[in-house]
C-alpha cells in the first residue's frame, strides 16, 4: 500500500518518533508503514487521517496487482 505519511510528516517537520507518539505506535511501525513494508490497521489509518485532517484515501492508496 502506497502512502504519503513521510511527506505529510516532513511538511510538519516531525520525526518518525513524533508521528509514532501521536499515533501511539512504535517508531519502527511508522518506519515500516512509510516504506510500504507494513499496512496499517483500519483504526490506525483512521487515526492518521484525523491527525492530518485528511480523508484516508488522500494518505493511503491501494497498489493494483
Residue ranges: model-predicted function:
Residues 3-22:
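Short basic helix-loop element that most often maps to the first helix and adjoining turn
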Residues 25-38:
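Recognition helix of helix-turn-helix/homeodomain-like DNA-binding domains
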Amino acid at each position: 500500500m502506497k502512502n504519503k505519511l513521510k511527506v505529510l510528516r516532513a511538511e510538519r517537520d516531525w520525526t518518525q518518533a513524533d508521528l509514532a507518539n501521536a499515533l501511539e505506535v512504535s517508531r519502527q511501525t511508522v518506519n515500516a508503514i512509510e516504506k510500504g513494508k507494513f499496512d496499517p490497521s483500519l483504526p490506525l489509518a483512521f487515526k492518521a487521517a484525523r491527525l492530518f485532517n485528511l480523508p484516508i484515501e488522500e494518505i493511503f492508496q491501494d497498489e493494483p496487482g
